[in-house]
Amino acid sequence: MTWTTPDLCDRYPDAMIAEPLFRHFGGRTAFAGPLATVRCFEDNSRVRELAATPGDGRVLVVDGQGSLKHALLGDQIAANAVANGWAGVLIHGCVRDVEILATLPLGVLALAACPRRTERRDLGDVDVPVNFAGVPFVPGHWLYADANGVLVAPQPLALDGAGGSI
């Protein structure tokens, strides 16, 4: 890894920083990429659908409206996300199968763990702006996460004087 969120914050003081609400559950602590979004409530139908599509290094941001009653991501959907090239998942809600999530090469941030799965009712919105943890998450914006926190920017951030970016 050639970047940290503290270094990015120092270089880009206007970057948006998410409130420190999230715990790491995945096997990858640091991850970054353009974001895709899902808004849902206790139904992971859209999360499952997106994880089955090419991720191309994107980060899936799921606004589960902070529900702690059902897990929106488990080992099967996470393994599918890995197989399809997703860099990570940020969930404003819960995950389950945490022992397995920790072994996968995927960034996973969530509020907590909950063993109960969702009921799939085919509900939820895809690629809509969502807002939680004090940050607007807009499809196509970039998310950077590591052990220090979560940063969001409207474009990829340059990391050197030559204009290189993540």
From Swiss-Prot:
MF terms (GO), sorted A to Z: 4-hydroxy-4-methyl-2-oxoglutarate aldolase activity; metal ion binding; oxaloacetate decarboxylase activity; ribonuclease inhibitor activity
The keyword Metal-binding is annotated on this UniProt entry: yes
Binding annotation for a divalent metal cation: D97
EC numbers, comma separated: 4.1.3.17, 4.1.1.112
Signal peptide annotation: none
Record-listed substrate binding positions: G74, D75, Q76, I77, R96
Catalytic activity: 4-hydroxy-4-methyl-2-oxoglutarate = 2 pyruvate; oxaloacetate + H(+) = pyruvate + CO2
Record's function text: Catalyzes the aldol cleavage of 4-hydroxy-4-methyl-2-oxoglutarate (HMG) into 2 molecules of pyruvate. Also contains a secondary oxaloacetate (OAA) decarboxylase activity due to the common pyruvate enolate transition state formed following C-C bond cleavage in the retro-aldol and decarboxylation reactions.
Subunit structure: Homotrimer.
Protein name: Putative 4-hydroxy-4-methyl-2-oxoglutarate aldolase
Biological source species: Xanthomonas axonopodis pv. citri (strain 306)
